[in-house]
Amino acid sequence: KEAVRLIRKSAVQGNAGAQFNLGTRYITGHGVIQDYTRAFTMFQAAAEQGLALAQFNLGLHYFKGRGVDRDDTQSYMWLEVSRLNGYANAVETINIVANKLTGSDVAKAKDLARECFDKKFKGC
């Protein structure tokens, strides 16, 4: 309980690593009540600070509809952002999501990802 309290405090103060850690705990229910919506919120906060693994997890949440409405275009966009930001393991998942989209939707998602990357992940 003390560990979760300290992680939560650090997350509220804007620490991206703590936000990611807390998001992961909300998925697993480790030390907190499982809550995909809160997990999504924590991953979003960390993703906007440039944490590639959080960006990848946002993409997964959009793909699975966990804590957010399912949206394959947003999923692809965040997965691509994580790849552009150095998370090479995103490629396999990007290909899976791409199979759910039309060619024009993939192009749109790639454009959104590039815009997001260029804006330093703010307001994506």
Predicted regions and their residues:
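Hydrophobic face of amphipathic alpha-helices that form TPR/SEL1-like repeat modules
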Residues: 6, 19-28, 32, 42, ...
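N-terminal segments that cap or nucleate solenoid repeat domains
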Residues: 3-11
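Short helix-capping/linker turns of helical repeat alpha-solenoids
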Residues: 12-15, 28-30, 35, 48-51, ...
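Terminal, low-structured helical/coil segments at or just beyond the last alpha-helical repeat
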Residues: 88-124
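TPR/TPR-like alpha-solenoid repeats
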Residues: 10, 25, 46, 61, ...
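Predominantly extracellular beta-rich ligand-binding scaffolds that present long acidic/polar faces
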Residues: 23, 55, 59, 70-79
